[in-house]
Structure formats: C-alpha cells, structure tokens
C-alpha cells in the first residue's frame, strides 16, 4: 500500500478559558481535549492527549481483537 502523499488533517479548536489560558479539542475527535496557559502549551498538551488516546485505543483493540486478524502499523507523517 502506497501511503506517499497521504495527509490526515485534524482541526484543533482553542477557546479562551474564563480563568485564563485556553481549553482545546479536535473537532473530529471530541474525546481528545486538553488545556494550557498559552496557545503553544495548549497545542503541545493537545498533541500529547492525542497520543494518549491513540495508545489507549490501540491497547484496547489488541485485548479484544479477532484471532488471526492481520494488523499493520501505518506511519503517518505530520506536516
């Protein structure tokens, strides 16, 4: 399978928090959310939250997977 040129885009939404800083989430993945004192910190925290959610779902899928299923890890480059 040729993944060259494949791009997956997610829309990050950063909202000012009443107490200061920002809350943030991905529109396409509402279960991925975070916060930060600055936009840069919020973005870094949101990407960390995405990694944690992906790791969680990967482990859960492996626990309940179908015997004999073929798994292939696909690497997607961020731009």
How should each PLM-predicted stretch be described?
Residues 1-10, 40, 44-79:
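Short, charged, surface-exposed hinge/linker loops at domain edges
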Residues 9, 25, 34:
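Conserved beta-strand segments that form the floor/walls of ligand-binding pockets within enzyme
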Residues 14-27:
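Short aromatic-glycine-(Arg/Gly/Cys) micro-motifs in beta-strand/loop hairpins
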Residues 20, 31, 54-55:
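Intrinsically disordered, low-complexity segments enriched in small/polar residues
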Residues 30-39:
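A short, exposed loop/beta-hairpin motif centered on an aromatic-Gly-Thr core
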